[in-house]
């Protein structure tokens, strides 16, 4: 089993989402010892924002690419191939200004490739990255999930659910720690709830795998 571990928080050791992704990967490896992990730090190794040089190979232009276009295409190919090879993807996605970090959005822009992660058909778009499990470590300084007003400002989990679904990923799970900037007690409670969610998600996946194996 191949697991891709992605972090996108800019705050390093102070990052809650990085703490959570590390816990998720550790729990996953304990439950699935044969798992092989690849790590992608989108801050240390950030893809450039999407440009026409990055877009050029996707428009059917395959011959006569400039050096810049070749470089950008190599970055995109590395990232989309890494994503497609993974059975499980763990994504650290902190809540920045009501959305995700630009580093994470730049990664999504690189892997959103027609013919690779999705295609358009007579019946509409079809995702091509089916069969994956994605676990998102979602961290928020405030609380946005418990009120209509808060949910209206949330473009983090909702966006990731949408774009991953567009790629064909139907098994998307969220480990949420919110209110982590609202005092020590609130942060401790959020982290405890997230730890319980991690345990539940990993156990549920293992139980489902056992059922599939027995049925086979």
UniProtKB/Swiss-Prot annotation:
The keyword Oxidoreductase applies. Keywords: Flavoprotein, FMN, NAD, Oxidoreductase. The keyword ATP-binding does not apply. Its EC number is 1.6.5.-, 1.7.1.17. Pfam families: Flavodoxin_2. SUPFAM superfamilies: Flavoproteins (SSF52218). It catalyses: 2 a quinone + NADH + H(+) = 2 a 1,4-benzosemiquinone + NAD(+); N,N-dimethyl-1,4-phenylenediamine + anthranilate + 2 NAD(+) = 2-(4-dimethylaminophenyl)diazenylbenzoate + 2 NADH + 2 H(+). One of its GO terms (molecular function) is oxidoreductase activity, acting on NAD(P)H as acceptor. Quinone reductase that provides resistance to thiol-specific stress caused by electrophilic quinones. Homodimer. Belongs to the azoreductase type 1 family. This is FMN-dependent NADH:quinone oxidoreductase. It comes from Acidovorax ebreus (strain TPSY).
């Amino acid at each position: 089993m191949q697991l891709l571990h992605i972090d996108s928080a800019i705050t390093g050791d102070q990052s809650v989402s990085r703490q959570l992704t590390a816990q998720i990967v550790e729990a996953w490896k304990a439950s699935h010892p044969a798992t092989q992990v690849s790590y992608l730090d989108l801050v240390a190794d950030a893809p450039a924002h999407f440009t026409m040089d990055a877009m050029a190979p996707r428009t059917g232009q395959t011959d006569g690419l400039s050096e810049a276009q070749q470089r950008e295409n190599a970055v995109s190919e590395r990232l989309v191939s890494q994503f497609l090879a993974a059975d499980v993807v763990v994504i650290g996605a902190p809540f920045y200004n009501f959305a995700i970090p630009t580093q994470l959005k730049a990664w999504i822009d690189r892997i959103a490739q027609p013919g690779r992660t999705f295609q358009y058909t007579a019946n509409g778009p079809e995702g091509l990255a089916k069969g994956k499990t994605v676990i998102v470590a979602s961290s928020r300084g405030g609380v946005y999930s418990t009120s209509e007003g808060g949910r209206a400002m949330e473009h983090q989990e909702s966006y990731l659910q949408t774009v991953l679904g567009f790629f064909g990923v139907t098994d998307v799970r969220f480990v949420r720690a919110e209110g982590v900037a609202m005092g020590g007690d609130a942060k401790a409670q959020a982290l405890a709830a997230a730890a319980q969610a991690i345990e539940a998600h990993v156990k549920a996946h293992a139980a489902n795998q056992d059922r599939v194996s027995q049925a086979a």
